[in-house]
From Swiss-Prot:
The gene is lepB. This is Signal peptidase I. Residues 1-33 are cytoplasmic. It comes from Leptolyngbya laminosa (Phormidium laminosum). Belongs to the peptidase S26 family. GO terms for cellular component: plasma membrane. The chain crosses the membrane at residues 34-50. GO terms for biological process: signal peptide processing. Residues 1-26 are annotated as: Disordered.
Amino acid sequence: MSSESDSPTPQTPPAQPAASQPKADSPLMEGIKTIGLSVVLALGIRTFVAEARYIPSESMLPTLEVNDRLIVEKISYHFNPPRRGDIIVFHPTEALKQQNPSLNEAFIKRVIGLPGETVQVTGGRVLINGQPLEENYIQSPPDYQWGPEKVPADSFLVLGDNRNNSYDSHFWGYVPRQNIIGRAVVRFWPVNRLGELGPPPSY
């Protein structure tokens, strides 16, 4: 009689492979992903929220000087129309393009006339519906005569603060609301002039 047990010998179950770990990206790939995400976020902010702009000319003296850097916000005009005194950045109008077909740079001017208002420039003053506009921010009183004209619906009359050296609405007409990019809110350069841009004028 055999001394060994007749019961079957237990079998060791085969080893199960360990769960595979996701392969870590190389430092180069991580860097590319980070840069890509940063670019997407920057483009989104620039398109929908705000962007930086610089001043290329003297047309907004003394408020804005050549090479000033500004932040232009793009959100508020989706909810409220521009106000008198806002400093806006806008795409060239059709009238501007007709005068200069190669023109594609954005303009920056101050909103003076609102839709439905009658505007006149006479005697060195701007009149809104016959009432003089108080303007303590202009370089010098305008030396030209213009109007009276009624501002069309959904359009704005804009003038440079340097009234006698500004290519603005008194040359080429009104800015449709759809052309407006946004409102200049803060000057961030040069640092000695950093701050919010001034309140709107009154009359």
